[in-house]
Amino acid sequence: MLKVSNISFQYTPKKEILTDISFTLGEGQHLCVMGESGSGKSTLLKAVYGLLDLKKGSIYWKNEEVLGPAFHLVPGVSFFKYVAQDFDLMPFTSVAENIGKFLSRFYPEEKEQRTNELLEVIEMSSFANEKVKTLSGGQQQRVAIARALAKEPELILLDEPFGQIDNFKKNSLRRKLFSYLKEKNISCIVATHDGDDALSFADQMMVIKNKKVVALDSPRNLYKNPSEHYVAALFDDVNELFIDEKKRLIYPHQIQVSIDSSYKAIVKKSFFKGSFWLIEAMFNSQVIFFENPENIDLGKEISLSFID
């Protein structure tokens, strides 16, 4: 189990990056850390990996304290793996050689088998002999993830792991990677901007705002019962409305066109989204967004209903 207790960190005396962060993570569990740029997500991963000397607090993995550079000649925990946004690959060697870099040469068959297994996970078997320098940024990102998994870690830390990967490839890769981690009982912490990384794959989701934790729960609970606009907006567009004198956070799919309702709105714009239209409208002098199966004429007055 990973136990993070009240950790704080600052690069300079006047610039605190993390403030009183606490959470636990069980073996084989996945935590998604979300927040806007500059909120401290990447710094948290570095702290957990042991790359930083904390201002206060402690980090333990299975009763062993994780200490920073002041205590280690080579910082970082040997049985953790950290995949940063700069991949640190060997550009003039092949994809397979990069993945197998830290595997023993004394067991070539096992090394080849392990490398091929991970090439399947990242969907790059056909690129095994390609030089890394010829790959796109997204492909290099996938190679970096596979290399981190080659010597199976107990905990893997992924910083925006799908940030450079094409959308058409991202969903398939996510399913394969997170299923593989579950199968191998590898704990995982992902720092991301993408709510899809959390909703389908994380056991817990942490939201950081202004260097502090503002929400920590299952992704399902945070999606259905967001504590504030900031949390809801990490998943989707969100409308903050006063309905029956009560403030509500309402996603676009929770607003429907009604045959007859006292809630009226004027359509201003529409955006085709494939399986539906996203409609922008004025409601009580406020811009709102809602989903509709068909386009609606601009300027048309419509009646709306709100669902839970």
What positions do the PLM features span?
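Conserved ABC ATPase "signature" C-loop
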Residues: N210-K211
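Helix-to-loop junction immediately C-terminal to a conserved catalytic motif
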Residues: Y49
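Conserved ABC ATPase "signature" region
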Residues: E110-F127, S179
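A short, proline-enriched helix->beta-strand linker immediately N-terminal to the Walker B motif
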Residues: A150-E154
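Non-catalytic connector elements of ABC transporters
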Residues: K247-D308
